[in-house]
Amino acid sequence: MEQQAPAILVISHGFFCRELVNSVKMVFGDVARLESLPLEEGMDPEVYEEQLNQLIDSYDGNVFVCVDIMGGTPFKSLAKAARTRCLYGVAGVSMPMLIEVLSDRDEMCGKELAAQAASVCRDMIMDLSEYMEKMHKIGLGE
């Protein structure tokens, strides 16, 4: 029996993850097995860690996790969860990255998915200064 595509969990400080998921749904429509877990201000890190473990377990560990930044509480909670589970994911989640992950999750294993998402997103970061200057000149009629 073929394994189901992984659930995608987006975790972050504050409600960034929730709103990122909402924004991606504007592009994809309703997406199955896509969840967010915000670390709310003042939340006990142990409570957050427990919520993350429960969410991972609700998908039998078949998850791919997108985290906002390395080193913060969501990341540390994920690192602890990975001690007892085989997990894959990426840090530095953005809308292009999440779109890439959702587009490829049916065709790639977790390790490949992480490498692909990181690679594509490196190419998505660009300096728009030259482009904006060109647009400004067009606006001025130059």
Predicted regions and their residues:
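N-terminal loops that bind phosphate or other acidic moieties
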Residues: 1-66, 70-142
